[in-house]
């Protein structure tokens, strides 16, 4: 579908990328224009000009590239820093100073009387060797940063000045051709002057992280409210906000907490220009930004004159803010600020790495929003606390990603359900009027304020929609301007160029269009954005006279409302996909009536689907049974009542309980008392379809194993389902952790020489690695080398988080940045005393093979009880267990594919059926003779039978006696049923030369009865089909009947209906008959399944089926109870 916005591509993700890139480029141009205007105007700058700027057309925005380049250069290479620290730029080869801030000599080289023996204090200037400024430990640590690809892993580095003895945090980042180092004074009263490292910073955020992780999920609002509350308590700022960017780049204060007496900004929307694109780019590079005092005078940077380009300050926290931003802060009385970027995954399905390949390229990221802290007085936050806030923002981003996935699933399910309901309404009436006049209707498909349908030169309107004449005018405009497109979406009819937009007012701003034909069109309408937005902040007191040129949040909000005055909320990609899907269904429904139906091709597709699906499922099922019986891991299964119906040899060996002794016993009697509630919960959830993973419980031992103590299992609960996805039991795939736990217990008790255990090549020793309290890898045993391919000397003394494990540029690659954040949380929690056990973990080994495992982390303490690091134990499931899980997954995927295929086929069949119905209805009005009309009626009956069968696909278990197969009672003539049923086997009879003889009396054929004629027709056709299939070539099939009337009262008669179908030959195989009578527990054949369903239908009619086999002949005897139709009483 086309759009008034930049052209859309075929996929949602590419459409999003293109429109987003176009918006960013346009916004950057506007940012540069406004910046130039501000610099030239100074105090006379009129802030309201951004309204006119954002309304300017693309042609008016051309010719500004020079301003854009100058603006970006000024933002990134401004040569000014904030005065709370100083800055040095070092040449990477010589380690000499090539640039320094004007305050650096005073901060780093001033002589202190507390430091003796400083005869010749060092001087700081261009070319100074930085080793001369600091004591040896700090200078060595700084020089070590030269060899690191990612120098940020070392931050902060603690250094001490030679002259004053003052400690500083050195925060290093790499710029083009040099290292840029921020130096921030350490305040011993606030933080201990030790090389704390990143792990110590994680501790500061532990409480906040735990609070976020404990949230149930499903509410973005609750998640944002929690994070602002935790940051508020962690940092002590006066105001903390969660600031969210919308699709059109404008921002919204989504959550907020303030100290008492401060005006709230909750619900306030800002124009996109309030946070320029250049600033957003810098937030992607440097995810924490601090401004200590907006009134403080910036400090200049002195650079080596030999430098060809100014040094980039993108990664520096000290980078001075732009004067325009400082003015804005001053106006809103925010003297200090701290901002954390919230970076999330792009919504692109194609970027997901495969399960067995390392992620060669990280998933694309985007800036979701910011966590913004404001303070009404100068405020400095030390680096360790800023780092903790950055990590907290990363954890928050992981949960935002989860919320997106959950919202996407809920949204897709809702849209799919609505599409299905609308499709069903369409197929019943084959007219688009049904989805406008009925309930639900097209307004329920996507969020809108009104809708309309132009069909057959008539107009139908729903709620807030233009008048009939206006809709016709819009349709004419579409045909003239967008005649070649199949539709259009715009958030502003005015911007899209519709000449009548002004007459529509602000209640009709946005529109989405789907063309069914060139003259038949569906419309959706939206009102202006302001109607959707409410500011939750303080109301504006009319006595407050705001200067319209003064930069302030209230004026930002006013400017935003002006910008979006004639705009609606934008139409999202998923909404346009839903509209496009409905458009295709409508076009198919109306157009297929005019196209010939490829019935034979459809039959072949269905046949191939059944054969492929059954063969695959049978193979998978056989493999599952074999695996369960022979697996070297414990596997047990229970039915829906908790009774054991599966107990393999491995679990029998571990527990001492034989298979025959375990079968039939309740699972709760076989587990330790301490595990009863755990297993009970697992069983309950699994039967509801909620499968728990990595749950530990203890199994009782019996016989010779009784004295060995309980068996400790870590179990995955898998719901056992039938072909119709109905949960019929639970399978527990387990891993024996008894020996593993004994080793871990013994290990954690050892206080002295533990290396003998760690480096023992005994296969019982699991892979173990460890880190000291500063995050350096300190342990890596033989089993770990075998698992990963990385030797001990290649990882020891490297940063565990960042160099050994990371999602890029590390020895052991993780799948994603989210996985890296989770590993950080686990290790941090262990250092804080919350040890992790059997957490799901995965990594790529040296050869790129992905390893799924469990991770347990324990803290390491010395004799004084001081935490000195962590030990991490990895447990890898056996090959048999992994194979079993993969087979189970394949089975589930096959069942899902089959269900999806059947759902598609059902959907696809309805469209040609609608076309056939239209064709027959047209034929009836062409003057057919009696015989031709009779054939048309037979086709109608067969059509209704097929519709009935398609509707049965909704049944969970169609073969169950208690299934919800229903009867639709109506009057019919038995002749119509018999003729329609026989017609369904005549082609098969002709192919085998079989004669069908209907020896039915006139009285039977003309009898009018009351019941479900279509179901009876289905039953007869099933038994006739089987009879013809198992008759010899040249044989015969004879149909005879008997009717017996029984009077019940004066005007009610019941008819005992009996029909006999006799055919020659050996007859139907006994196996199929056993399946019909449910005497065979094997998977039923197609014929057995159809006869079983027909038998259940006969039972609903108070009837049954019998089969008689005689010499050379077989007979089906069908009985049912019908009511004589009122018009037939007395005949």
Swiss-Prot record:
Domain GAF: 219-404
Keyword entries, A-Z: Chromophore, Photoreceptor protein, Receptor, Repeat, Sensory transduction, Transcription, Transcription regulation
Pfam family, one: PAS
Record flagged with keyword Transcription regulation: yes
Signal peptide residue numbers: none
InterPro entries registered for this protein in UniProt: GAF (IPR003018), GAF-like_dom_sf (IPR029016), HATPase_C_sf (IPR036890), His_kinase_dom (IPR005467), HisK_dim/P_dom (IPR003661), PAS (IPR000014), PAS-like_dom_sf (IPR035965), PAS_2 (IPR013654)
Molecular function terms from GO: phosphorelay sensor kinase activity; photoreceptor activity; protein homodimerization activity
Keyword Transferase annotated: no
Residues the record lists as binding phytochromobilin: 324
GO BP annotation list: detection of visible light; red, far-red light phototransduction; regulation of DNA-templated transcription
Sequence segments annotated as region (Disordered): 1-26
PAS domain location: 620-690, 750-834
Domain annotation Histidine kinase: ranges: 904-1124
Post-translational modification: Contains one covalently linked phytochromobilin chromophore.
Superkingdom classification of source: Eukaryota
Biased composition (Low complexity): 1-23
NCBIfam families per the UniProt record, alphabetical: sensory_box
Quaternary structure (record): Homodimer.
Function according to Swiss-Prot or TrEMBL: Regulatory photoreceptor which exists in two forms that are reversibly interconvertible by light: the Pr form that absorbs maximally in the red region of the spectrum and the Pfr form that absorbs maximally in the far-red region. Photoconversion of Pr to Pfr induces an array of morphogenic responses, whereas reconversion of Pfr to Pr cancels the induction of those responses. Pfr controls the expression of a number of nuclear genes including those encoding the small subunit of ribulose-bisphosphate carboxylase, chlorophyll A/B binding protein, protochlorophyllide reductase, rRNA, etc.
Family: Belongs to the phytochrome family.
Name assigned to this protein: Phytochrome a
Lineage, top ranks: Eukaryota, Viridiplantae, Streptophyta, Embryophyta, Tracheophyta
Gene name, Swiss-Prot/TrEMBL: PHYA
């Amino acid at each position: 579908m086309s759009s008034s916005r930049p052209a859309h591509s075929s996929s949602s993700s590419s459409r999003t990328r293109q429109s987003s890139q176009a918006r960013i480029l346009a916004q950057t141009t506007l940012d540069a224009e406004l910046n130039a205007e501000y610099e030239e105007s100074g105090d006379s700058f009129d802030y309201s000009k951004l309204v006119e700027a954002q309304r300017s057309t693309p042609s008016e925005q051309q010719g500004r590239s020079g301003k854009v380049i100058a603006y970006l250069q000024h933002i990134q290479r401004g040569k000014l820093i904030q005065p709370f620290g100083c800055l040095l730029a070092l040449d990477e080869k010589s380690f000499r100073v090539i640039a320094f801030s004007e305050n650096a000599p005073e901060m780093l080289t001033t002589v202190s009387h507390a430091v003796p023996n400083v005869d010749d204090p060092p001087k700081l200037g261009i070319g100074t060797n930085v080793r001369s400024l600091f004591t040896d430990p700090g200078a060595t640590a700084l020089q070590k940063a030269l060899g690191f690809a990612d120098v940020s892993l070392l931050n902060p580095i603690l250094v001490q000045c030679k002259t004053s003895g003052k400690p500083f945090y050195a925060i290093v980042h790499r710029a083009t051709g040099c290292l840029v180092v921020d130096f921030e004074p350490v305040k011993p009263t606030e933080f201990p002057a030790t090389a704390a490292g990143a792990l110590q910073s994680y501790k500061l955020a532990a409480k906040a992280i735990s609070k976020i992780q404990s949230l149930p999920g499903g509410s973005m609002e609750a998640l944002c409210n929690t994070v602002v509350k935790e940051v508020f308590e962690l940092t002590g700022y006066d105001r903390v906000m969660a600031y969210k960017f919308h699709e059109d780049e404008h921002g919204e204060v989504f959550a907020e907490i303030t100290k008492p007496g401060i005006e709230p900004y909750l619900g306030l929307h800002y124009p996109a220009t309030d946070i320029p694109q250049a600033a957003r780019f810098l937030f992607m590079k440097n995810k924490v930004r601090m401004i200590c005092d907006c009134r403080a005078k910036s400090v200049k940077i002195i650079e080596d004159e030999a430098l060809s380009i100014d040094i980039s300050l993108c990664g520096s926290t000290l980078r001075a803010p732009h004067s325009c931003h400082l003015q804005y802060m001053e106006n809103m009385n925010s003297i200090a600020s701290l901002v954390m970027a919230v970076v999330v995954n792009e919504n692109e399905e194609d970027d997901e790495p495969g399960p067995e390949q390392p992620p060669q390229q990280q998933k694309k990221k985007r800036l979701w929003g910011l966590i913004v802290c404001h303070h009404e007085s100068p405020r400095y936050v030390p680096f360790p606390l800023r780092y903790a806030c950055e990590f907290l923002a990363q954890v928050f981003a992981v949960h935002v990603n989860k919320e997106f996935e959950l919202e996407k699933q809920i949204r897709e399910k809702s849209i799919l359900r609505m599409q299905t309901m609308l499709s069903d309404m369409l197929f019943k009436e084959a007219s688009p009027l049904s989805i406008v006049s009925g309930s639900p209707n097209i307004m329920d498909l996507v969020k809108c304020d009104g809708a309309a349908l132009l069909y057959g030169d008539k107009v139908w309107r729903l709620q807030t929609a233009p008048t009939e004449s206006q809709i016709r005018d819009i349709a004419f405009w579409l045909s003239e301007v967008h005649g070649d497109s199949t539709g259009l979406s715009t958030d502003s009819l005015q911007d899209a160029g519709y000449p009548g937009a002004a007459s529509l007012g602000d209640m009709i701003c946005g529109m989405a269009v789907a063309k069914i034909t060139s003259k038949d069109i569906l419309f959706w309408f939206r009102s202006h954005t302001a109607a959707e937005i409410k500011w939750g902040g303080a109301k504006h007191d009319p006595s407050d006279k705001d200067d319209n040129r003064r930069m302030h949040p209230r004026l930002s909000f006013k400017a935003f409302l002006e910008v979006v005055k004639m705009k609606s909320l934008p139409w999202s990609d998923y909404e346009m996909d839903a509209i496009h899907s409905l458009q295709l269904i409508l076009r198919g429904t109306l157009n297929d009536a005019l196209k010939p139906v490829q019935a034979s091709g459809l039959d072949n597709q269905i046949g191939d689907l059944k054969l492929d699906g059954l063969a695959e499922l049978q193979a998978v099922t056989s493999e599952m049974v074999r695996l369960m019986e022979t697996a070297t891991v414990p596997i047990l299964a229970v039915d829906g009542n908790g009774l054991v119906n599966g107990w393999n040899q491995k679990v029998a060996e571990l527990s001492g309980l034989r298979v025959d002794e375990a079968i039939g016993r309740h699972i709760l009697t076989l587990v330790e008392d301490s595990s009863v509630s755990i297993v009970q919960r697992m069983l309950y959830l699994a039967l509801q379809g909620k499968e728990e993973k990595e749950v530990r419980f203890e199994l009782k031992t019996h016989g010779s194993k009784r004295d060995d103590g309980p068996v400790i299992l870590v179990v995955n609960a898998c719901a056992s389902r039938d072909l119709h996805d109905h949960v019929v039991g639970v399978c527990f795939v387990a891993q024996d952790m008894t020996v593993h736990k004994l080793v871990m217990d013994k290990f954690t008790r050892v206080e002295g020489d533990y290396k003998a255990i760690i480096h023992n090549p005994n296969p019982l020793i699991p892979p173990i690695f460890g880190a000291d309290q500063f995050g350096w890898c300190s342990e890596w045993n033989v089993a770990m080398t075998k698992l990963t391919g990385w030797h001990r000397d290649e990882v020891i003394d490297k940063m565990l988080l960042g160099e050994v494990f990371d999602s890029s540029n590390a020895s052991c690659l993780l799948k994603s940045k989210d996985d890296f954040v989770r590993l950080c949380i686990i290790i941090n929690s262990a250092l804080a005393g919350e040890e992790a056990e059997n957490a799901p973990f995965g990594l790529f080994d040296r050869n790129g093979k992905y390893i799924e495992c469990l991770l347990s982390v324990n803290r390491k303490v010395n004799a004084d009880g001081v935490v000195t690091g962590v030990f991490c134990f990895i447990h890898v499931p056996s090959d048999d267990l992994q194979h079993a899980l993969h087979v189970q997954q394949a089975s589930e995927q096959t069942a899902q594919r089959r269900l999806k295929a059947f759902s598609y086929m059902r959907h696809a069949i309805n469209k040609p059926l609608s076309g056939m119905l239209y064709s027959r209805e047209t034929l009836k009005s062409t003057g057919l003779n009696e015989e031709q009309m009779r054939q048309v009626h037979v086709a109608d009956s067969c059509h209704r039978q097929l519709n009935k069968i398609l509707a049965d696909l909704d049944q969970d278990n169609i073969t169950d006696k208690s299934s919800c197969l229903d009867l639709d009672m109506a009057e019919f003539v038995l002749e119509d049923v018999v003729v329609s049923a026989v017609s369904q086997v005549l082609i098969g009879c002709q192919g085998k030369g079989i004669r069908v003889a209907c020896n039915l009396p006139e009285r039977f054929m003309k009898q009018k009865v009351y019941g479900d004629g279509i179901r009876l027709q289905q039953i007869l056709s099933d038994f006739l089909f089987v009879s013809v299939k198992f008759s010899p070539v040249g044989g015969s099939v004879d149909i005879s009947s008997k009717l017996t009337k029984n009077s019940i009262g004066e005007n009610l008669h019941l008819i005992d209906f009996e029909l006999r179908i006799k055919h020659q030959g050996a007859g139907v195989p006994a196996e199929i008959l056993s399946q019909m009578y449910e005497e065979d527990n094997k998977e039923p054949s197609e014929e057995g399944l159809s006869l079983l369903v027909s038998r259940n239908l006969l039972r609903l009619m108070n009837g049954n089926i019998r089969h008689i086999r005689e010499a050379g002949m077989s007979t089906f005897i069908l009985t049912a109870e019908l009511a004589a139709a009122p018009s037939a009483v007395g005949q």
